[in-house]
Amino acid sequence: MSPSADTPEISNSADSTVLSLKKSLCSEDSPLPIRFRALFSLKHVATTADDDATRVAAIEAIAAGFASPSALLKHELAYCLGQTGNTAAVKPLRQVLSDLKEDPMCRHEAAEALGALGWADNLDILREYRDRKEEDISIVETCEIAIERIEWENSAERQKEKLRPSDFASIDPAPPMPESDKEAEVEDLGRKLMDTNADLFSRYRAMFALRDLASPPDLPTATPAVLALAKGLSDSSALFRHEIAFVFGQLSHPASIPALTEALSNTNEASMVRHEAAEALGSLGEKDGVEDTLRKFLHDKEKVVRESCIVALDIAEYEKGEDAEYALIPESAGAAA
């Protein structure tokens, strides 16, 4: 969304901040953890700045990072763009999804981000790549889920559903299952999570309902919900498995450590799953043995796994309280306070 004629111009201080963060993000000489911190700082600006011009400038700075050779960084750029709720994010996301030379992990994240934005105008490109012959299965599945999310977002059914309040501020690939008069028990949601006869969107809804029953961690349903989610790491879909690992990263629940460690340690596992498991372990970095596990894979054969472990160890330092803020400027946490 380009600023209109009456939109306030970006202030000098905001312009200086965005330019400085963009420089850190786009510099191949900057350590990867610094680039990630710059990215989440730009996301903060893109979602909280008082004027549209500054928000758009931050989005454009994020999009400039797609020139990087790092698939890990680029997939995180796409995720952040999808969280902005701003039409300025649409063009770069469509370009990434359309680029058949781009890493499938980045293209999948771009498709998911278009779904998170929720606008029906993007159904055309999502249907195109869902139906494209010989398309990577993770992209086909992501487009399928994104289409259903957009259709749900714009449906009359959406207005009737009562959703359980969530501790998490993220825009998820699917909403949790709606509340009913008798709230679904963990066991029931676990069955729905693992029902391979159901469509992925429905299974994702069960996944995010279980996530919300696992937070805060002292809820009586928390550990059972985490253990139910862990069963999803045995699913046949790598996309599904990677989303389970992402949810574990949001929860930072110690009961997930064994399952995440197993996923990261399995060198036959898809790299998109292993990398997500590594980052999730980073959010648990204050727990005994987690940093040692991550260090074991700093020289993994898969670049995205190596880089994820570098970033995860940086996150672990933050989680241990050695840094005041993860972002270079204050960034709201994924889970609402």
From Swiss-Prot:
Heme: is it a keyword of this entry?
A: no
**Biased amino acid composition, Basic and acidic residues:** 156-165
Tell me what this protein is called. Deoxyhypusine hydroxylase
Q: Tell me where on the tree of life, at the top rank, the source sits.
A: Eukaryota
> Which amino acid positions bind Fe cation 1, per UniProt?
H75, E76, H108, E109
Keywords tagged on the record: Cytoplasm, Hypusine biosynthesis, Iron, Metal-binding, Monooxygenase, Nucleus, Oxidoreductase, Repeat
Write out the catalysed reaction. Answer: [eIF5A protein]-deoxyhypusine + AH2 + O2 = [eIF5A protein]-hypusine + A + H2O
Q: Where in the cell is it found?
A: Cytoplasm; Nucleus
Residues that bind Fe cation 2: H242, E243, H275, E276
The record's section on HAMAP family has: Deoxyhypusine_hydroxylase (MF_03101)
Q: Name one GO molecular function term.
A: metal ion binding
Enzyme Commission number(s) from the entry:
1.14.99.29
Q: In which pathway does it act?
A: Protein modification; eIF5A hypusination
Give the required cofactors.
Fe(2+)
Q: What broad class describes the main subcellular location of this protein? A: cytoplasm
Q: Where are the HEAT-like PBS-type repeats?
A: 73-99, 106-132, 202-235, 240-266, 273-300
Give the record's GO CC terms. cytoplasm; nucleus
Q: What does this protein do?
A: Catalyzes the hydroxylation of the N(6)-(4-aminobutyl)-L-lysine intermediate to form hypusine, an essential post-translational modification only found in mature eIF-5A factor.
